[in-house]
Amino acid sequence: MKKTALYSWHEEAGAKIIDFGGYLMPVQYRGIIAEHHAVRSAAGLFDVSHMGNFYVRGARAKEFLQYMTTNDLDNAEDGQAQYNLMLYPHGGIVDDLIIYRIDSETFFLIVNASNAQKDFEWLQQHIAAFEGVVLEDHTDQLSLIALQGPLALNILATVFPALDVPALGAFRFCKVLFQGTEVMIAGTGYTGEKGVEICLPNAMALPLWEALFEAGKESGIQPIGLGARDTLRLEMGYSLYGHEIDQDTNPLEARLKWVVKMGKGHFMGKEACQQVEGNLKRGVAGFSLDGRVLPRQHFKLYNSDRQEIGWVCSGTLSPTLQEPVGTCNVVREYLKPGTPILVEVRGSLHTGVIRRLPFVTTSLS
């Protein structure tokens, strides 16, 4: 089992540690609900160093990534990040990822922890056709810290006074020095709040973590575990691999058509997406349940005639709304917000309704 460079800090802080993606990671400190509210109201600090990260380099690096992913990197400038997908030929999703364009021949990729080895092998499997392109795995050398919340950028400015924080912007990134070491700061996140994700060498993770905590002390900054990270992303309707998206789900079914650029050249899985386009049979939507029962992944959904129409992708008790919410994969006719549904929970059917995503408004709304 791997440990991040911040593992000892989490342990000393009394975090509950679990195995996640082959890493020993903090799932909670004070409690998921308290941590969730801290991010929505002030600021939270996340250790997400378990995420996989790769460099793709070479004169044909962009050409290679254009073929391997669905979004259009011609729309990304140097210093810009782009949400993206890798597909199998049949249209199922290999993974979702963020690609950072450092320059025309250098790209940095952040992928899901549980898929890192699979993703690396998938990319490596297809790289030979693009002569001179090199794929490097830097996962074990780098740490990733997320600072998120309405007050996050104020805290960031305290630690990096020379950084032009307003100019950073969503899905923009820059490289700056921290105690003489170069770090990459990106206007990205997984919470729906203002914030950044900071990538840096392992040796500098603890000094930066402690500096951000010191700077955010008066603002109420809190350490945040993976439990609250999940409730925060679910309130926004963000996809999680293995839940809303997987190898059997086409991105057009998963509310991710905006990431699939049919107008660019050929890419892996394009034909499968073209076949589905205009002929969707299913889709992913939000829903809420009456009462206090918790919907969990794989629970079945029914229409008012008790015909099975889908399943739960993710579910939780929303700390913000104080009601059970989730995402579901349902037959197309039931995707409209306001449509009544039934969800089977431990053998009983509970009433609910399809909801528009996201469930909440945030500091970025």
Curated annotation (Swiss-Prot):
The record lists the catalysed reaction(s) as:
N(6)-[(R)-S(8)-aminomethyldihydrolipoyl]-L-lysyl-[protein] + (6S)-5,6,7,8-tetrahydrofolate = N(6)-[(R)-dihydrolipoyl]-L-lysyl-[protein] + (6R)-5,10-methylene-5,6,7,8-tetrahydrofolate + NH4(+)
Q: What is its EC number?
A: 2.1.2.10
Pfam families hit by this protein: GCV_T (PF01571), GCV_T_C (PF08669)
- GO annotation, biological process: glycine decarboxylation via glycine cleavage system
Q: Membrane-spanning residues where?
A: none
Cellular component, GO, one term: cytosol
A GO MF annotation of the entry reads: transaminase activity
Q: Which UniProt keywords apply?
A: Aminotransferase, Transferase
User: What role is this protein assigned?
Assistant: The glycine cleavage system catalyzes the degradation of glycine.
Q: How does it assemble?
A: The glycine cleavage system is composed of four proteins: P, T, L and H.
Q: According to its UniProt record, which protein family does this protein belong to?
A: Belongs to the GcvT family.
The protein depicted here goes by the name: Aminomethyltransferase
Q: Which gene holds the coding sequence for this protein?
A: gcvT
